[in-house]
Amino acid sequence: MDALVAGAGVGAVKFCPSCGSPRVERVVPSGDTLVRDVCAACGAIHYQNPKVVVGCLPEWEDRVLLCRRAIEPRRGLWTLPAGFLENNETLATGALRETLEEAGANVTLGDLYAVISLPQISQVYMLFRARLLDQRFGPGPESLEVRLFAESEVPWESLAFRTIARTLRNYFLDRRLAAYRLHVSSIGRRTPITPDLLAAG
């Protein structure tokens, strides 16, 4: 699941996961500087941390593989295969799993290519370059369609998320320069989606 919006609202804990008490308060614990969910019954502090989204930018010759979303948010729009990292997974394992689940594609992972922070919704995208092993791919349950696109064919106006547009713009620019590098940036509510070489991110 590519989840730019899913899980965006980080809400208060209603019941303490440690003791089950409903007496959970939003306070700054002693020795801390941020408001946390703290159980008034047992004293347990419940930390809420950013979610990690992992995925791939699958390549085949001069084309990239995109999936058209079958689920909300942004149903019917195009994205790279990506979703939430699961517990006990490495970044690489999660990226391979998401690519197989969403695109039915087997890939060989290359280098980590994009790290994009989305602080307003407490998410971090981590996307790898990847090489398709063959041209066998197809939509999984979360995709309507899976296709290879040349740069001139990318449906820029129909991309689901700014993270994906940023990553693809950087990728095609790097390809023209014949110099791929790790892109580390952030996207806020008003951040443009131009390549991070050209715009502050």
Regions found by a protein language model. Give the residues of each.
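Short connector loops at helix/strand junctions that flank enzyme active sites
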Residues: 34, 49-53, 59-61, 73-75, ...
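Unchanged
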Residues: 85-170, 174-180, 192-201
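Conserved Nudix-box catalytic region and its N-terminal flanking loop in Nudix hydrolases
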Residues: 3-6, 59-101
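A short beta-turn/loop motif at secondary-structure boundaries
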Residues: 31, 72, 116-120, 187
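Active-site donor-binding loop signature of nucleotide-sugar glycosyltransferases
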Residues: 41, 69, 82, 130, ...
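A broadly conserved sequence feature marking short terminus-proximal activation segments
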Residues: 1-16, 170-175, 185-196, 200-201
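Conserved hydrophobic/aromatic beta-strand scaffold that supports enzyme active sites
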Residues: 15, 36, 57, 66, ...
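Acidic, metal-coordinating catalytic segment for phosphate/diphosphate chemistry
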Residues: 8-55
